[in-house]
Every structure is written in C-alpha cells, then in structure tokens.
A protein has these predicted regions:
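N-terminal, positively charged/glycine-rich alpha-helical extensions of SAM-dependent methyltransferases
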Residues: 1-25
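Conserved alpha-helix/loop element of class I SAM-dependent methyltransferases that forms part
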Residues: 36-54
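A short glycine-rich, Lys/Arg-flanked "PGG" loop and its adjoining helix->strand segment in the class I
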Residues: 135-147
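Conserved beta-strand signature within the Rossmann-like core of class I S-adenosyl-L-methionine
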Residues: 148-155
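Short alpha-helix
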Residues: 177-192, 198
Length: 236
C-alpha cells in the first residue's frame, strides 16, 4: 500500500479554534467557512449528476474537525462518509460532535482501506503537505478508491490575488506552499488519474454577490478563488 504522509501534530493546536481562525482570514470576502464548504460540495454534486454518478461511499481526506461530512452525506446522497485527518485532536472533536451510523472519523495513521470508496473529496490539504510527500499522498488516495472511482481535488488558487491575501492572513497557512492548477494536473496524471474536468469557483465576494449568477459561466477561466479537478482512477 502507498505510504501515508508523515503524521503531524501542528494542526492539533488549531483544532478548537480552527473555524474562528479561518473565518477571521475570510472576513475580507464577507463570507464564512460554511458558505465555501456548501459551494464546493454542491458543485461536486452537480458535476457527479452530469456524469450520472451516485457514489455510495465517500472519503473526506483531510477532514479536519469533520464539518463537511454532513454536507457530503446530504448533498451527494451517499450511504456513508469516512473522514480521515492527521490531526488527532481534530478527529477527537469530529467523533464527539458529528459521528453517526453513516459518518465516521479516523486518524490518518489508522486508515488502511484499499479499493473501498466510490469518491474521495479533498479540500485545501495539499498546500500543507511537503512537496516530497505529495505524490505518495495522491497514490494513497488512489489506492483507497475503487477502480473507476472519482477524486474531487480542491485547492486554493494561487492565480487569484484574493486567495493569496486570505492565505496571508491565516495563521495556519504561514508555511503553506500553494498548488497551481497546472502542477496539480501533472501530479494527478502521474499518479494514474484520468482528468474529467477542471472548474474555477468563487469569483465574487459578498459585496458583489449580485454578480454571482455569472459564476456558472466563468468556471473555465482560471481566476476563481478555488479550483476543483475532477478525475477518475484508471482501471490499472
């Protein structure tokens, strides 16, 4: 099985105040973490629907304190969600607040699944992973997917000045190394994923919310605050 990225406790100190810290950084957008999480998951659901795909099992890789798991369960209408994270404190909080028969959480060190999931969702994780460990991490995700399974890779877009500003205001992003869309494409292709589509979202802050209906026609312009690469695990 591919090697998991090294366990790090750095995020443990942010677990209790993670959303407060991130919301402070997001203040310039006029929105909070829930707005962006909901937008990501709904966009993923829309993309899967266009592909006539209905995943039964979903892995939330780098789930943090687990707040996206209920959104994935509801919007993707899947049967189960498993969240994994390298932060033991975050997983403890997720299990205490959100675990249910359909939603479970594990520390990354305890995660050993192979060929088990129909879809993997991963948001804003790779800019925290050292360059030398990124391909191993993608291979780990690939091995967790069933052949033909879908990987929804979300990252902050370094080509967006607003994104760079928000990250500069976020305490736990101070050591982040951003992942460009072109770099992500190369990494995913090297790991054996077939790219299905790339979309760019979150162009307008709340102050320009009246322009947000335009975002659905801007998704191929590489300037949105975040991007999603939707790809498929090849059969071999």
């Amino acid at each position: 099985m591919p090697r998991a990225p090294e366990e790090r406790s750095g995020f443990d100190r942010y677990a209790s105040g993670y959303h407060t810290c991130l919301n402070q950084a997001l203040a310039a957008t006029g929105e909070d973490t829930e707005y962006f999480a909901r937008g990501r998951v709904r966009w993923l659901a829309r993309c899967l629907s266009k592909l006539n795909l209905s995943p039964a099992s979903v892995l939330d890789f780098g789930c943090g304190t687990g707040t996206t798991a209920p959104l994935l369960l509801a919007e993707l209408r899947c049967k189960s969600v498993l969240g994994v994270d390298s932060s033991s404190e975050s997983i403890a909080q997720a299990n205490q607040a959100l675990s249910s028969p359909a939603i479970r959480f594990l520390r990354l060190r305890d995660f050993h699944s192979r060929d088990a999931f129909d879809c993997v969702y991963c948001n804003g994780v790779f800019h925290h992973i050292p360059l030398s460990e990124r391909l191993d991490t993608v291979n780990l995700i690939r091995s967790a997917l069933r052949p033909g399974g879908i990987f929804a890779f979300w990252e902050n877009n370094p080509w967006n000045p607003g994104t760079r500003y928000v990250m500069s205001q976020c305490a736990f992003d101070e050591d982040a190394i951003t992942v460009s869309p072109t770099g992500a494409h190369r990494m995913l292709r090297r790991a054996g994923f077939e790219r299905l589509r790339t979309d760019y979202l979150f162009y307008f802050p709340n102050a320009l919310a009246r322009l947000r209906p335009l975002e659905s026609v801007l998704t191929k312009i590489p300037l949105g605050g975040q991007y999603q690469i939707l790809c498929r695990r090849t059969e071999v």
